[in-house]
């Protein structure tokens, strides 16, 4: 585990945050009786099913009064959180990597560094704890120039049109957005390959100019001419079996050797623990981004990891995603 907090006395509640699609981070407060309360993720992501955060609070703690201790795990993959009250009423709180399906062999002299946990304490209730976390994250974790900027209000083409759009309908959406004071239009899934439904083309990151009725550069200029910013959707970690990429490199999808892969939303996950896989997708994405002034990127991930073929896969996969993101941020 990355963090361990021992309390020699006290009677505590555990607060964690569960969720599902379109209903993330619901607060659940439970009295910690004798035994162990645990939650986490085995999905390959930190997940909105169970958020990698926990609060240990005195039973009478409120928004504005009382003791509370927070832990935030600064990591995007599998995790485990445990709270235990033992037979002599001591309490222990643990947060870190999940050890289920996890092993990481080290050669002589090699080291392994676990991700960090941000811990915070408040004697003045949950609001103060929240403010402390806000300050810490904005000052010391967020490093982009946007850390202290007001976020733009955006409208997304997905709920407006799903896959059924053209360049003209995106521009019409931009005109309507401008009239309502909306700052940005995001062109969602469906702009690439032969992507008119969710059965094909993930992994083939080239602009479908026939669908857009012109080049991406022309569309971006038309949207900007309406006085709004332009954003674009990507799902770089995923691949459809009906794609040029999969036909050329079926071994790039995560699967257990000798077994059929598990599909979800008609897609498989690319093995981002492998540099050659990341490099290919990075080059494709950059060839798109270089075509015009893109203001915003929506990075999607629409399925969880199932075919874990090795104990180090999930961890190395997350590091691969971080490497990919770092390269994008550095380049743009």
Please identify what each model-predicted range represents.
Residues 52, 57-79, 121-145, 153, ...:
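Glycine-rich, aromatic-flanked loop segments that form ligand/cofactor-binding clefts
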Residues 87-107:
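Short acidic, Pro/Gly- and aromatic-enriched capping/linker segments at domain boundaries
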Residues 147-152, 183-194, 233-236, 292-303:
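Core alpha/beta catalytic barrel or barrel-like domain that forms the active/cofactor pocket
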Residues 208-226, 246-332:
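Active-site neighborhood of glycoside hydrolase catalytic domains
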Residues 104-123:
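Short Pro-Gly-centered flexible turn/kink motifs
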Residues 146-162:
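Glycine- and charge-enriched low-complexity intrinsically disordered segments
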Residues 1-84, 100:
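Polysaccharide-binding surfaces and accessory modules of carbohydrate-active proteins
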Residues 157, 161-247, 253-254, 279-280, ...:
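Aromatic- and glycine-enriched glycan-recognition loops and surfaces
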């Amino acid at each position: 585990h990355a963090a361990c907090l021992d309390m020699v006395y006290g009677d505590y509640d555990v607060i964690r945050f569960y969720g599902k699609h379109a209903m993330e981070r619901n607060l659940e407060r439970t009295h910690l009786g004798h035994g162990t309360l645990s939650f986490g993720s085995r999905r390959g992501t930190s997940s909105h099913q169970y958020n990698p955060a926990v609060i240990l609070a005195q039973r009478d703690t409120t928004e504005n009064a009382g003791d509370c201790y927070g832990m935030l795990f600064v990591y995007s993959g599998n995790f485990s959180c445990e709270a235990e009250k033992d037979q002599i009423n001591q309490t222990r709180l643990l947060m870190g990597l999940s050890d289920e399906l996890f092993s990481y062999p080290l050669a002589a002299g090699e080291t392994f560094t676990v991700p960090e946990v941000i811990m915070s304490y408040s004697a003045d209730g949950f609001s103060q704890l929240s403010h402390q976390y806000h300050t810490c994250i904005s000052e010391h974790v967020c490093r982009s120039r946007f850390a202290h900027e007001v976020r733009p209000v955006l409208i997304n083409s997905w709920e407006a049109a799903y896959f059924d759009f053209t360049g003209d309908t995106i521009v019409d959406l931009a005109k309507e957005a401008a009239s309502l004071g909306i700052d940005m239009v995001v062109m969602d899934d469906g702009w690439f390959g032969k992507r008119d439904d969710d059965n094909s083309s993930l992994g083939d990151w080239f602009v479908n100019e026939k669908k857009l009725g012109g080049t991406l550069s022309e569309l971006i200029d038309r949207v900007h001419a309406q006085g709004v910013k332009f954003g674009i959707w990507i799902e770089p970690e995923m691949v459809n079996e009906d794609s040029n990429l999969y036909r050329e490199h079926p071994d790039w999808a995560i699967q257990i050797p000798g077994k059929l892969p598990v599909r979800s939303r008609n897609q498989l996950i690319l093995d981002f623990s492998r540099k050659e896989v990341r490099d290919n997708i990075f080059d494709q994405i950059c060839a798109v981004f270089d075509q015009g002034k893109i203001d915003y990127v929506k990075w999607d991930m629409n399925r969880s990891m199932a075919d874990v073929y090795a104990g180090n896969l999930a961890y190395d996969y997350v590091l691969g995603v971080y490497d990919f993101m770092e390269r994008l941020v550095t380049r743009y």
